[in-house]
Amino acid sequence: RVSVGFTNQEGILKNSDFKRVTAALNLNPSFFDDHLTMNLNAKGMYARSAYADGGAVGAAVKMDPTQDPYNFTSEYHKAQFGNALDQTLQNYGGFFQWSSAASLGDSTWPFIYNSTAECANPLAMLAFNTEVAHSRAFVGSADIDYKVHGLEDLRLHLSLGADVSKGRQAQNKSTASPSAMYYGSVGGESILKRNLSLNEYAQYYKDFNDNHHFDIMGGYEWQHFWKSTNSDYVGRYPMTNDDPTLAGTERPHTPYQYKTDSYLVSFFGRANYILMNRYYLTATVRDDGTSRFKDHWAWFPSVALAWKAKEENFLKDISWISDLKLRLGWGMTGQQAGEKINNYNWIPTYSV
């Protein structure tokens, strides 16, 4: 089975939208008279999101409705700018802004957006703030089950899984943007995640007669979680900097990069015995290992008894009881995930 999907959604604000393409493939082949069965799945996704500056909504409420958003038409502004009107309008990217005299030390920027007015031009906010995110994801799995020829009570099972995703977000504020006027800003970040898993086990079923059932299972599980984060945002020196040779150049900045991974490995076993389809005995044991703790390995046993009372003769004919089963169990559990548990807490750190 194959499926493909496409979404194209226009945003509420200008220059915002969402596009997504998805594809999925599912195969269920079987071989050797259904002794070997497979379930293969693959899903892929690509999405592009363009974000608009949400502050434009509030700015639109505050904006003077009589003011031309693309020009300075009042006598007040003509007198304020004088001969610098055309240059200021060009600096603002052709948009009106409430302004004040600049102290940038740059003769080509005599005026700058007056942030104390708290009334930026909403159209300029939407035009000069660009933020786009790209997301890619792939999820794949393969389940393979084999019923051994000549020993059909024995099954071998293998599961493989992969979950890979990558997100990249870029932001660019023009020098004409009221939130980064004159200086502008540019930057972005990307995150790559990769989770891999393997699960394999053997399971043996045996019905000795109508009253006795026994099954046992043993297996191995492996998981790897990996994540890489990169980000970099660039600022610039102002024209008023003490060293004029630095004016307009990038400030020193160190790109942020962080990688982390962890492993989870398990050996497990389980045995079930059922007597007369009424009395159940279950025992399990796991030997789990995680890279998140200094003591990597721990045992987790459990045992349970159950009585399916509905199968007893004195309850079978009571119609208002559809099922009744009593269970008593004991076990130990562990936790290697949590808000205060990260991959490297147990490793000492040193500062030089």
Regions found by a protein language model. Give the residues of each.
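Outer-membrane beta-barrel translocator/receptor signature
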Residues: 1-24, 32-36, 136-138
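Extracytoplasmic/secreted cell-surface and envelope-processing proteins
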Residues: 11-12, 49, 292-293
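Extracellular/periplasmic, surface-exposed regions of secreted and cell-surface proteins
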Residues: 20-21, 26-32, 41-46, 54-55, ...
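N-terminal, post-signal-peptide soluble/periplasmic segments
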Residues: 33-83
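Flexible, solvent-exposed loop segments that connect beta-strands
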Residues: 178-182
